[in-house]
Amino acid sequence: MKPLKILISNDDGVFAEGIRTLAGAAAFRGHQVTVVCPDQERSATGHGLTLHSPIRAEKANELFGKGVSAWGCNGTPADCVKLALNEILPEKPDLILSGINHGPNLGTDIFCSGTVAAALEGTLAGIPAIAISIASFQWRDFSFASQLALEIAEEALTKNWPQKLLLNINTPPCKSSEMGQLGWTRLSIRQYEEQFTRRIDPRGNPYYWMAGNAVKDIDSAGDGPSQWPSDVAQIESNSPSITPIEPDLFWRGNISDLPAINLKNYFSR
């Protein structure tokens, strides 16, 4: 296939090994690669935008290999993609990749994910987009995930890529020789035990550190073909997952299941 114009972003920042590996792999395959990503760690920022302070971007080519044009931006992941599409890039890219994230983006955790938000900006702009994550904060070999994402993108772009489709890929933290088959999955619904650590600052005022542990994964039966496993189950079986996502959050249950609100009792004020 002809070389692609690829925009790459992330939420781990411009110094993260995951994005540098992905950008290098894309350039090695002959693609035209531009990186526009946060200049620092921006994990768990979701789809936040910077509206009350200036957004700045500086060249960061020296952090990447040959053939990669890079920018570090002081904004959120979503800011970075918006800025790239509207100011930095001379023309619309063929593909947006976000990652490789240092840690999983599974189930309903995607609502907090800056990685997925960056890819979603591409989807909203009508550009094919993929978010890529490794399901471990300790695993540091990003080569397999890079090749997997690029091969999937190259194949999918020669076939049918529906409008509003975002692909969310997670790979297990193990060698490729130990992995099972890549499979289509649906989002799990994750429930957490929230934890806050309360501390006192030198002025005697309390402050908090937030953490949490996933205590339950609810299989989201009915979302996608019923025979598909959840993304969490797929990763737990040491197999890579690929989950199709769209930005339309409209509820698709039965009308009879909605609360029986008498709408005629309400009027416009």
Swiss-Prot record:
This is 5'-nucleotidase SurE. The keyword Transcription does not apply. The lineage of its organism: Bacteria, Bacillati, Cyanobacteriota, Cyanophyceae, Synechococcales. Belongs to the SurE nucleotidase family. Its cofactor is a divalent metal cation. It is an enzyme of class 3 (hydrolase). It comes from Prochlorococcus marinus (strain MIT 9211). A divalent metal cation binds at residues 11-12, 43, 101. Its main location: cytoplasm. It is found in: Cytoplasm.
